[in-house]
């Protein structure tokens, strides 16, 4: 999704906006439903000169009463436990040409998207990819192995967790990775 003044580099605030809108619909808290430019304004790092600062994004979500943290996962199995509790995971990935079939852009040195589920065949992961050209192309299926390579080789399994305080989450000792 391309936005004026932010364009294709707003993947982090766009993903965060998606997750906050999800929690707005789940909790009925309309204050969580923020437009992407609003989230981008709230997450902009003037030193970095961009919106991809992970702690800035989680801090922004926290200002609305959500629990938010940057974590390192070591497996997609850990992510499956969060998804089973209804918590989407915002993952930082990178890949080269031909390494992530079906991606809306051919390659990226750093891209954030939302893991929203796993296909019943176990071989594909369901994501919302903010690089899509328009809302209709945001939901995508990626090959599980290709996605894992893009995530673990790219960022070492870095992800944001954002969810309401008091939400039933997985046992942290087996689900949060090494952070």
What is each model feature region?
Residues 7, 12-19, 53-60, 75-79, ...:
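Stable alpha-helical elements in mature extracytoplasmic
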Residues 12, 68-69, 108, 125, ...:
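Mature, folded catalytic cores of secreted/periplasmic enzymes
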Residues 1-50, 103, 119-121, 176-179:
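Active-site-adjacent structural segments surrounding the nucleophilic cysteine of cysteine proteases
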Residues 4, 118-179:
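Noncatalytic regulatory segments and standalone regulatory/sensor domains
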Residues 38, 42, 64, 82, ...:
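Residues that form generic nucleotide/phosphate-binding pockets
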Residues 45-46, 50-73, 84:
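Mid-length scaffold segments of soluble, non-membrane domains
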